[in-house]
Amino acid sequence: MSAFDTNPFADPVDVNPFQDPSVTQLTNAPQGGLAEFNPFSETNAATTVPVTQLPGSSQPAVLQPSVEPTQPTPQAVVSAAQAGLLRQQEELDRKAAELERKERELQNTVANLHVRQNNWPPLPSWCPVKPCFYQDFSTEIPADYQRICKMLYYLWMLHSVTLFLNLLACLAWFSGNSSKGVDFGLSILWFLIFTPCAFLCWYRPIYKAFRSDNSFSFFVFFFVFFCQIGIYIIQLVGIPGLGDSGWIAALSTLDNHSLAISVIMMVVAGFFTLCAVLSVFLLQRVHSLYRRTGASFQQAQEEFSQGIFSSRTFHRAASSAAQGAFQGN
């Protein structure tokens, strides 16, 4: 029966693999605790790969720390405001100095205008009588008033020519009628008086008014020129015995069969009529310009008062009167 107990498939030598000396040696070796296990303690760990340094600057990159903006202090605000005020003050001082310089230049220009040599009337250099006035429309008269001022100057010239023609007409009248010697004498007197008086009494005031925008000069012109228009009306009528060869005097010569003398006197009467019409027209033009300037009679009074009180002649006269009154007492 023992023969049946034998395993035919069994190894004749019963070998236990776990009884192998190499295995038992490993299993009997002391095992360290799990806590003492260090996977990085092996000497055969991964080798370290050297890092290749990039070419370039040897200085490391430095990040600038960001600085948050701080609120300005009150002292800084005050200092900035003071600096702005100082700059504005310097700018104002510079502008004031520039204005003062321009004002001095303007005063020098005006002074140079005043010291210019008189050029009217245009007399030759050898004449012993020198010019009495300075007249330059382009320099002294504003551009808006130059045209009307020249027209008034031409009217004065026409006025002078008409008076001279009136003298010749009265001479012809006197040559045809010996009883008209008074008219001829008065015509000479009118020519000698009215020619310079018209220039001084109404042309020069309007010239000064346009030059300096003086209300008082405007009122002087209006008053004298209105009287001049009245004289023109009397002259164009031609009342005999007044030295005017107007329409009545010219028509009266037709009875004496002096046609040539009558024609000459009618031409002069036409000149007087033309002067009267132009005077009325120019008076209206000047008055309209005067109204646009906004001047008034009160302003003219103030200018007249300032001119009187600032006059050296008035001061001397007042001082002389005061001294005389004091000595009399």
UniProtKB/Swiss-Prot annotation:
Source superkingdom: Eukaryota
Transmembrane segments: 154-174, 182-202, 219-239, 263-283
Membrane topology: Multi-pass membrane protein
GO cellular component, one term: recycling endosome membrane
InterPro entries, alphabetized: SCAMP (IPR007273)
Stretches of the chain forming a coiled coil according to its record: none
Parts of the chain on the Cytoplasmic side: 1-153, 203-218, 284-329
Annotated spans, Disordered: 1-21, 51-72
Lumenal side: 175-181, 240-262
Modification sites for Phosphoserine: 319-320
Region (Interaction with SLC9A7): 203-218
Alphabetical keyword list: Endosome, Golgi apparatus, Membrane, Phosphoprotein, Protein transport, Transmembrane, Transmembrane helix, Transport
The keyword Metal-binding belongs to this UniProt entry's keyword annotation: no
Protein location: Golgi apparatus, trans-Golgi network membrane; Recycling endosome membrane
Known tissue expression: Widely expressed.
Single GO biological process annotation from the record: post-Golgi vesicle-mediated transport
Keyword Protein transport: yes
Assembly and oligomerization: Interacts with SLC6A4 and SLC9A7. Interacts with SLC9A5; this interaction regulates SLC9A5 cell-surface targeting and SLC9A5 activity.
UniProt family annotation: Belongs to the SCAMP family.
Function text: Functions in post-Golgi recycling pathways. Acts as a recycling carrier to the cell surface.
Name by which UniProt lists this protein: Secretory carrier-associated membrane protein 2
Organism: Homo sapiens (Human)
The encoding gene: SCAMP2
